[in-house]
Amino acid sequence: RLGSEHKLLPVGLASVMTYIDVHGFDFDLYDIDINDYADEKVEKFIKNNKYDIVMYGSIVTHYKWIKWLTKIIKQYHPKTTTIVGNSVSGSIPEIFLRNSSADIAIIGEAELTVLEIILAIYNNNETYETSIIKDISGLAFIDNNGKFIITEGRKGLKKLDDFPMIRWDY
């Protein structure tokens, strides 16, 4: 996308955003890649904007940068729940979680898993605890005893009609 004439959201990101949106949750999109933001601008944005949950992801080749981003989020907002998806966390979840300060790694398709995480946090007085996500499929985390936990894989999505038409106007 960088340098491309056509700047579009990745399909996966747009699908997750649409799914969260139609279930009544507000969010801000800060698309670092499409806007080619410098690290300093990203850090300033994070410093000046507090969120309960921050979700982000990339391909595994951006591992080092995603670790940096996670560190910056936790540096300014240690209680913010960080959820990381795509292959950067899903392909190497234990390595990623043990070597970053991220809270949750998404494994596989994210729409249902992310919504269930948000609902669990919302229903727990907006407080993240590992105990509230242990039964959610399609994720990994490090529990309070330092044990790596990977939950049951989410069953393949069978009917696209169960999902809303992707919105592209975010």
Report residues per predicted region:
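Radical SAM [4Fe-4S] cluster-binding motif and immediate context
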Residues: 161-170
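Glycine- and acidic-residue-enriched helix-capping/strand-helix junction motifs
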Residues: 2-13
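Glycine-rich beta-alpha loop elements in corrinoid/cobalamin-binding modules
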Residues: 12, 19-157
